[in-house]
């Protein structure tokens, strides 16, 4: 991959992420960071002999810095970074490789009630990616008609438990680097989670509280304003998503733009975790993480005939 193309992506992304502090991460993190926080299998992480490991996911590393800053900073913390990850697991999907560059973002703060933190920061993360797509399109990329999917991992887990499905089995079988693995597992188990909908208030009346009210709030306070600002984007709520169980703890997002040849891939993923709450031993702490596959986007969504501006 031409490094100048990757650098051009980063230049645009950092410019769009003006609300976030840009952090240059170390290539290694404390031993166990990827597993303890991110749940990444230790067999897929490169460890060193000096109690460190190579970054397999940069969002836990950003979470460590968020927690450090939150100890002395009363306000919200917003961090972003561009970093190359290394994983040891094999990839059999075209375009996926054991080492890859991600642009990631973490936002940390305190729960102030009425889903205020979730509303603000879920909206900010989605807004960033949709604005990024627009900016990249002006630079020779082709990220059209983005599909934004909002899910709730806690609700999906609850529905699976009612159906008698063990969460650990789901985590073993479903992986983000195996597109379609969630759908295949549901078919194998004979489980039918609710189909994606555009308005939970009218189409998901049977789901339990408090998740039902939370999804309705996200529709009113997050989706509707974003739809008005980004008419090219499609929004829907999905409870059939199984990727992220055990990683995220509540609301999650996934964005899939359309490429020039009509293909659609989930290039952006994110959601709320309990990492800073655990690190700071404070259940009121909140954290949302997200990332976009820089290298995959540059390979799959860039129109080669158009030059990158300097």
What label would you give each PLM region?
Residues 3-30, 35-37, 46-141, 154-165, ...:
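Positively charged, Gly/Ser-enriched RNA/tRNA-binding surfaces
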Residues 146-151, 206:
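Short internal beta-strands
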């Amino acid at each position: 991959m031409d490094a100048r193309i990757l650098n051009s992506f980063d230049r645009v992304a950092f410019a769009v992420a003006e609300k976030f502090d840009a952090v240059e991460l170390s290539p290694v993190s404390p031993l166990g960071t990827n597993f303890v926080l991110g749940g990444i299998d230790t067999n897929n992480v490169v460890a060193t002999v000096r109690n460190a490991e190579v970054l397999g996911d940069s969002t836990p590393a950003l979470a460590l810095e968020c927690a450090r800053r939150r100890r002395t900073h009363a306000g919200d913390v917003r961090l972003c970074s561009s970093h190359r990850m290394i994983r040891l697991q094999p990839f059999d999907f075209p375009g996926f490789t054991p080492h890859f560059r991600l642009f990631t973002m973490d936002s940390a703060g305190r729960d102030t009630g009425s889903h205020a933190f979730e509303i603000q920061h879920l909206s900010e993360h989605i807004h960033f990616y949709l604005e990024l797509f627009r900016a990249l399109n002006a630079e020779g990329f082709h990220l059209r008609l983005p599909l934004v999917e909002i899910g709730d991992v806690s609700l999906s887990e609850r529905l699976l438990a009612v159906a008698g499905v063990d969460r650990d089995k789901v985590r073993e079988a479903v992986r983000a680097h195996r597109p379609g693995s969630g759908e295949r597992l549901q078919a194998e188990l004979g489980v039918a989670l609710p189909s994606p909908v555009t308005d939970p208030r009218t189409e998901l009346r049977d789901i339990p509280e408090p998740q039902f009210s939370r999804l309705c709030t996200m529709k009113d306070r997050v989706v509707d304003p974003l739809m008005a600002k980004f008419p090219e984007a499609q929004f829907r709520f999905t409870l059939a998503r199984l990727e992220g169980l055990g990683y995220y703890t509540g609301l999650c997002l996934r964005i899939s733009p359309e490429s020039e040849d009509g293909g659609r891939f989930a290039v952006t993923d994110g959601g709320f975790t309990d990492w800073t709450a655990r690190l700071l031993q404070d259940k009121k702490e909140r954290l949302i993480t997200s990332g976009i596959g820089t290298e995959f986007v540059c390979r799959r969504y860039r129109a080669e005939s158009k030059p990158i501006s300097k």
